[in-house]
From Swiss-Prot:
Coiled-coil regions, chain positions: none
Family: Belongs to the polyribonucleotide nucleotidyltransferase family.
Protein name in the entry: Polyribonucleotide nucleotidyltransferase
Source organism of the structure: Shigella flexneri
GN (gene name): pnp
Domain of life: Bacteria
Entry keyword set: Cytoplasm, Magnesium, Metal-binding, Nucleotidyltransferase, RNA-binding, Transferase
Cellular location(s): Cytoplasm
Class of the enzyme per the UniProt entry, highest EC level: transferase
Biased composition (Low complexity): 694-711
Residue span(s) of domain KH: 553-612
EC id: 2.7.7.8
Amino acid sequence: MLNPIVRKFQYGQHTVTLETGMMARQATAAVMVSMDDTAVFVTVVGQKKAKPGQDFFPLTVNYQERTYAAGRIPGSFFRREGRPSEGETLIARLIDRPIRPLFPEGFVNEVQVIATVVSVNPQVNPDIVAMIGASAALSLSGIPFNGPIGAARVGYINDQYVLNPTQDELKESKLDLVVAGTEAAVLMVESEAELLSEDQMLGAVVFGHEQQQVVIQNINELVKEAGKPRWDWQPEPVNEALNARVAALAEARLSDAYRITDKQERYAQVDVIKSETIATLLAEDETLDENELGEILHAIEKNVVRSRVLAGEPRIDGREKDMIRGLDVRTGVLPRTHGSALFTRGETQALVTATLGTARDAQVLDELMGERTDTFLFHYNFPPYSVGETGMVGSPKRREIGHGRLAKRGVLAVMPDMDKFPYTVRVVSEITESNGSSSMASVCGASLALMDAGVPIKAAVAGIAMGLVKEGDNYVVLSDILGDEDHLGDMDFKVAGSREGISALQMDIKIEGITKEIMQVALNQAKGARLHILGVMEQAINAPRGDISEFAPRIHTIKINPDKIKDVIGKGGSVIRALTEETGTTIEIEDDGTVKIAATDGEKAKHAIRRIEEITAEIEVGRVYTGKVTRIVDFGAFVAIGGGKEGLVHISQIADKRVEKVTDYLQMGQEVPVKVLEVDRQGRIRLSIKEATEQSQPAAAPEAPAAEQGE
């Protein structure tokens, strides 16, 4: 009854298997894709009919990781998977971005893609596997989809591009780039790099696109064997007469409105034109569909902006194609934060802060590929007021998570190593105004805030968003795009980096036919823009401050004998807990004996260091210590010396005469001088008050003659 159809092929160093017809046969299509023991099960369900009045394409992509895939039980209270993690959200976006532009315009039937990770090899990341699975399932489904796409990860090791590097290889790589595209064109790039050149980045994109052709070929072969018939879907016929009537009423007026350079004024005027046009048309014929009229107006609006750009006219806000909007850069804008900056580019503004914490503040991520600790956190917030709207405020949405991750990638390459700067760093970008490329404003603001906080970043970084308008062979690359240019253009191309090279590159291409030459022009134009922004930023702050904020914790590092770690921690953490309370510091101990003491007050840190040195000091036989009586027993007393170490003063060692009752001589908490008589092989300490007293008396005696000699 079950008749699986399987296709195997070699993809770089991995073997990929595509299998369909075995599971989820009630879904529109389902594929199990495996790559060296990492397996992702991808299903697609498409509704045959669109909902009445549906005016957008409702595509949903869900990516979910099951802990059983790694042979683990979830660590949560309920012991089952909950809402998507940040990593799952990012991979869902990674799948969504290259497939969305391949559905035909006018197709508004609901489509859901669900990718479930069911087995994982710690060396093979499931994201590429899931992207291949989504492409295969959509291609098999018969849903109108102009795919398939291929997906590849590209690394750069020893000056060589590496296809789909393993997790271990990625640690050595200067590049982590994911590229997806059809047979003819690149559609999406997502990457982080250690300041590589424009040519190296472009080479990686081209390499990945060439290598992924084997995926596309094998999906096409699988479709020939197991694909469902293509849906008989046709776009709604275009009402040419209505289009012409709307254009006659609105086109010239919209063209004039798009000469208004202020965003709010322009939006207000465009809204008036649209409202008046729709009202006029409905008065002429009340059977017209208002949504349809809105779509026609949007198409005219798009055409107006695009044709002006292609004709070489000034852009919406009056700029030339490669001009950057006016910049305003300020640092130290918030008095009690560790570092802060306000970065404004035209009508886009980001208030960015940097906060320093200890290793205890690092985020522990329990991921499918294994547990890891993140000491650099980047959070991006996009409140509704930034675009003059009202809306829900709460947990971050997919877009905020994606933009935060991109901005983090832009800064990551210049962050100092933990051994040089042992702080956990959190950057938060509050977008206070937005009109295009707020993620790149966040990169610029983060660089400034980190320098203001005294974080020794390797170089300043800046980011820029590029756009593209293309008709036939005629194209124009735009620098520093506005929100409108992003929506109406054919490409969104974000580049972040330093003067030396690129740290992050993200591309989303909405059309086919973007050539290597066009990408080269865009990258070179972006470099010029990046250097211009860095020049303005350097006028505000050109190097990290020499010292961290007075409000930031200072981390002092000392080394102790690893054998003494247990003494500093104490039974059940009792000693270290008491130490932190007593000194008002945060103390962290590593397995190699490295102790990090964090305090905002230098005196508190010195006190903590002194106490740790006391605790870890070797007890010297014959030395006299001042100790405190901690316990009294019939045969003597226990006295704490040298940082919590406890020794026994036998009843015979309390005084130089016979002692009947210990409490006649000693009380709890009493401070007494004690001499160390012996430390046995088990670490037990024998003490004597009697000998300490005898020793201290003769020691003081010779001072009198010395004083006499001095007289």
